[in-house]
Amino acid sequence: MKVRPSVKPICEKCKVIKRHGHVMVICENPKHKQKQG
């Protein structure tokens, strides 16, 4: 999980979602997981 000021999809399987007011990227590849904060 990477915590970044700006989250962007890295590959085609990355999905940008909003959870509890946080923008997150979820993906099949665990290295692509990101969270804004």
Curated annotation (Swiss-Prot):
SUPFAM superfamilies: Ribosomal protein L36
Name of one Pfam family that matches: Ribosomal_L36
Annotated keywords: Ribonucleoprotein, Ribosomal protein
A GO molecular-function annotation: structural constituent of ribosome
UniProt KW Transmembrane helix keyword: no
GO cellular component: cytoplasm; ribonucleoprotein complex; ribosome
GO BP term, example: translation
Keyword NAD: no
Similarity remark: Belongs to the bacterial ribosomal protein bL36 family.
NCBIfam families registered for this protein in UniProt: rpmJ_bact
Name of protein: Large ribosomal subunit protein bL36
Organism: Symbiobacterium thermophilum (strain DSM 24528 / JCM 14929 / IAM 14863 / T)
Gene coding for it: rpmJ
